Amino acid sequence: MEREKEQFRKLFIGGLSFETTEESLRNYYEQWGTLTDCVVMRDPASKRSRGFGFVTFSCMNEVDAAMATRPHTIDGRVVEPKRAVAREESAKPGAHVTVKKLFVGGIKEDTEEHHLREYFEEYGKIDSIEIITDKQSGKKRGFAFVTFDDHDPVDKIVLQKYHTINGHNAEVRKALSKQEMQDVQNTRNNRGGNFGFGDSRGGGNFGSGPGGNFRGGSDGYGGGRGYGDNGYNGYGGGQGGGNYGGGPSYGGGRGGGYGGGAGYGNQGGGYGGGYDNYGGGNYGGGGNYNDFGNYNQQSSNYGPMKSGGNFGGNRSMGGGPYGGGNYGPGNASGGNGGGYGGRNRY
């Protein structure tokens, strides 16, 4: 029987005691299944634990079983298990944010709340479902929000980008609230704009390609090499990828990509800054999802950034409130600097 892809079987374990070894980590997680890999990430020079590691199970059901029995305590310390983020996703802003709300795009006019509930309740307990409609016409705008009682269902769902709901392909993303978007704005203002998400050697901008407003210099968020070893580059963010997050970033470099604290930004843009160019249109203002209109007319908590005030480049992908670039990782034209605290995260 062919084994499931590693990304579905792998857990990131943060908050480890510095005394925790691979043996004690393995012994703890083997209670839920067979481990095919177990590692505590260490500083290459001092060999001291960096306080996080990875465990890979033989199947996703074992991951589900482990996550269903949180909290986990190892060597007297409560640790933070999360489903690992694949390399190609880890550099995207928001990939490491812990949220309970899911954005579902691409749903069709004939999709009702019960279709969404029937599909997503298999992943976890649902608190609410909101299908967004146009306030004036009442017409569905092609996307919805599903809120769970825990972050793990969202983490599990977004491991697979597309889901077939009511016979149609829908795209899923983590959803951020207005407050979380505002936190990004505030951080930008506080730091004077001298930073970038950076998806290429620590530079980067808050935009989709050339012309971004916020070039990354030596203080760039997500720059540098980050933590991690080459053996784990399958879950890194590329050189200088990384997340835009608080706390010590667990990654963003060759082996990390697992941001600590609360990262900000929607994964790849989401409904915020261009829907990741999905379909070539700016979500909420142009050529995507039946041209459902501008999101800024909605009263939802998941509201808009003002036009021109979003974190984007010079180009607009559509006519909506998010014109101004994709809220995704930039192509990094500014600087080769390091991560949040300096040029090198080692």
UniProtKB/Swiss-Prot annotation:
Keywords: Nucleus, Repeat, Ribonucleoprotein, RNA-binding. Residues 297-340 are annotated as: Nuclear targeting sequence. GO terms for biological process: mRNA splicing, via spliceosome. It holds the Pfam family RRM_1. Residues 193-217 have a biased composition (Gly residues). GO terms for molecular function: mRNA 3'-UTR binding. Residues 9-92, 100-179 form the RRM domain. GO terms for cellular component: catalytic step 2 spliceosome. It is found in: Nucleus. InterPro entries: hnRNPA2B1_RRM1, Nucleotide-bd_a/b_plait_sf, RBD_domain_sf, RRM_dom. Residues 182-217, 326-346 are annotated as: Disordered. Forms complexes (ribonucleosomes) with at least 20 other different hnRNP and heterogeneous nuclear RNA in the nucleus. This is Heterogeneous nuclear ribonucleoprotein A2 homolog 1.
